């Protein structure tokens, strides 16, 4: 059989281990020289590919340099938020497949979240419609953990570990003074509260901070919130409150919208960051106590020093599994994670495949049964689910300047 080439791209927001998934795809591709001649990367995703921006991994990261991807945050290939047209009759599709043919592409991999799986779906369906032999596989990633038909997603474990660690650190700082205070920590999550729920992992004992955790899966009532804080002050001096950026009231109005400064992004979506600051001002004005807000922002997804070893290993495994599946003829699929336990009841994960058409444009939220009846905490079921995903540490090499050493695209 004549050799063909493999191409891989990254899309959407980066994670601490999206480059580990990339490493898995590339390293596995390079172990099949009798079948795969070149392993190419799309610079800035499908959008960059349309503008002929590609690289050859054997030239860009030769030898041991490739392994540097596994401790490098961000997206080595760069990203994009380009959405392919809904109609497969659009001229962009024959243009893409003409480029694939010119590069002798036999396997296409896209690492990303929901919109990226939408791209995988469209490309695989178009390939089938024209009888193209190109295999199209999706590699999951998202710190939001909101992809359906998979136990969890690469990136969530490391982000959850960062959130829990940071919340624990903020708690120790807040406990310094014996003066009533409320610290509100705003965490990423528009519709799904998985990452905010992970703040519960910071607790060392029952009754420890964070005392309140608010997710977008449950409506937020400002008056009840203030009453809950007042009651908590009867036993506690310093209160830590963790909120998802997407919390909303019973009418569906985002809490951040009560701040008149909230704007919209280039897609017309409301810019949700700001609910923490709004609640800070609300607490200060209504309760008359010291209040501050902390927005974790992009640090949740780019911390290399707190990468979960479990998350990293699973991301690499997903990349390798996807290549093996594509070489076996699979297409139009996303690599999924299936949770298992060994004979001693310990956590294990195996990779599987799911029809990407059943995944794109769907969203997995935190089960309501994992949220306490009062709406401001998570149950032990969530703790058992999340704790295995943050286990283990990795060693990030340091440069001569004493700072983490990453690999960069030239």
Model-derived segments and their meaning:
Residues 43-47, 141-145, 187-192, 216-222, ...:
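Glycine-rich beta-alpha junction loops
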Residues 99, 107-112, 118-133, 153-292:
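Accessory alpha-helical/coil subdomains and C-terminal extensions
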Residues 15-25, 49-50, 93-94, 114-122, ...:
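Short glycine/serine/threonine-rich phosphate/pyrophosphate-binding segments
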């Amino acid at each position: 059989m004549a050799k063909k080439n493999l191409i891989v791209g990254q899309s959407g927001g980066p994670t601490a281990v999206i480059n580990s998934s990339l490493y898995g795809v590339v390293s596995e591709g390079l172990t099949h020289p009798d079948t795969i001649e070149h392993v190419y990367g799309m610079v800035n995703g499908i959008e960059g590919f349309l503008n002929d921006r590609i690289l050859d991994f054997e030239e860009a990261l030769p030898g041991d340099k490739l392994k540097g991807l596994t401790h490098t945050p961000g997206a080595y290939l760069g990203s994009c938020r380009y959405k392919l047209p809904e109609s497969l009759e659009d001229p962009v599709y024959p243009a893409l497949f003409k480029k694939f043919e010119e590069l002798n592409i036999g396997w296409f991999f896209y690492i990303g979240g929901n919109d990226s799986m939408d791209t995988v779906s469209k490309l695989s369906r178009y390939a089938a419609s024209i009888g193209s032999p190109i295999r199209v596989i999706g590699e999951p990633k998202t710190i939001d953990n909101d992809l359906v038909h998979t136990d969890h997603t690469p990136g969530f474990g490391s982000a959850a570990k960062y959130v829990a660690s940071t919340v624990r650190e903020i708690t120790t700082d807040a406990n310094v003074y014996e003066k009533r205070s409320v610290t509100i920590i705003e965490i990423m999550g528009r519709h799904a509260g998985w990452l905010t729920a992970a703040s519960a992992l910071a607790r060392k004992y029952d009754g420890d901070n964070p005392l309140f955790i608010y997710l977008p899966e449950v409506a937020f009532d400002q008056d009840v919130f203030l009453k809950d804080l007042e009651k908590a002050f009867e036993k506690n001096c310093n209160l830590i409150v963790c909120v998802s950026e997407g919390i909303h009231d019973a009418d569906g109005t985002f809490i951040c919208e009560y701040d008149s400064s909230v704007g919209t992004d280039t897609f017309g979506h409301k810019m949700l960051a700001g609910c923490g600051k709004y609640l800070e001002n609300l607490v200060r004005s209504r309760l008359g106590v010291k209040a501050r807000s902390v927005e974790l922002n992009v640090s949740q997804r780019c911390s290399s020093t707190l990468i979960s070893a479990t998350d990293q290993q699973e991301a690499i495994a997903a990349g390798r599994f996807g290549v093996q599946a594509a070489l076996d003829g699979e297409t139009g699929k996303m690599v999924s994670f299936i949770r298992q336990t060994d004979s001693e009841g310990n956590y294990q994960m195996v990779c599987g495949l799911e029809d990407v058409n059943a995944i794109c444009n769907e969203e997995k939220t935190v089960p309501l049964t994992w949220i306490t009846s009062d709406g401001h905490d998570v149950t032990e079921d969530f703790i058992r689910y999340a704790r295995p995903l943050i286990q283990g540490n990795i060693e990030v090499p340091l440069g001569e300047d004493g700072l983490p050493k990453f690999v960069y695209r030239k």
